[in-house]
Amino acid sequence: LSRGLEDVYKRQAPKLQGTLEAGNEAAKAIMTTDTKEKEVAVQIEVGGKTVTIGGMCKGSGMIHPNMCTMLGFVTTDACISKQLLQEALSQDVKDTYNMVSVDGDTSTNDTVLLLANGMAENPEINEKNEDYQKFCEALNYINTTLAKKIAGDGEGATALFEVRIIGAESKEQAVTLSKSIVTSSLTKAAIYGHDANWGRILCAMGYSGAQFDPEKVDLYFESKAGKIQIIENGVAVDYSEEEATKILSEDAVTAIADVKMGDCTATAWGCDLTYDYIKINADYRS
């Protein structure tokens, strides 16, 4: 194996380029059932030096972290200690890639790598100071953007479905509720049908295992077409179905559930469930 990898390296190393076009080709090369490449980059200033962080990923089906069929590669020229680099990634993955679910199915194959070469020549980030915080914020932007690209490009998807839980008693409660909603097949099908089916959302919250009072829940739908309240204190309000359908017809839709128990929040990302998801996976042969 090592000899084979060495041969591949010798053949491919001369082809390496530091151009945007080469990066895009790399993002395309790792695609499987993805319909589009997924990449993003950002620059920040650290110690008077410009630091670049860039990332690419692939994933479309069997997406339900912790383990899922996804690959993520993030690189930076920042000078940062190995310990803090690992800690920054480990913490950020919890709120980004691990909050994505396309179909609720896991896999034994997933990787997220964060590599730093120090070529920005900034003063080494070796403590949790302002520079470290700035780096973590940029890393979160990269990982959040890539996570949403995975969710929005789920197999057969026509819409990105975001779920925000607010007013939770704890972070754990918010995470559990948001992931239960975003994974619900009935809710995902309703999103595809542009149907403000609040009953399916409350149902998913109910079987999540998290404790909450359904009679206190407020529920909203939001997209670039507007925002509408569907439930107040667990009871449907007199909303316009036409307006709700308009809001739910966009290619990115957010459900916001306020459980009124505290100040904690969580956001999960998924997609609608379509006929094409069935077709893609019914036609697949191993």
Describe every region a protein language model picked out.
Residues 3, 54-56, 71-76, 112-117, ...:
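Short glycine-rich or small-residue beta-strand-to-loop segments that form or flank ligand, phosphate
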Residues 1-9:
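Single conserved hydrophobic/aromatic residue that forms the stacking wall/gate
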Residues 12-46:
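Contiguous domain-boundary segments centered on the initiation and propagation of an alpha-helix
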Residues 118-193:
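A glycine- and small/hydrophobic-rich beta-loop-beta segment
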Residues 112-114, 158-170, 198-208:
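A short beta-alpha structural unit
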Residues 175-176, 183, 187-286:
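Internal helix-turn-beta structural module
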Residues 61-121:
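Mobile "lid/hinge" segments at catalytic clefts and subdomain interfaces of large enzymes
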Residues 20-27, 41, 97-109, 145-162, ...:
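Flexible, glycine/charged-enriched surface loops at secondary-structure junctions
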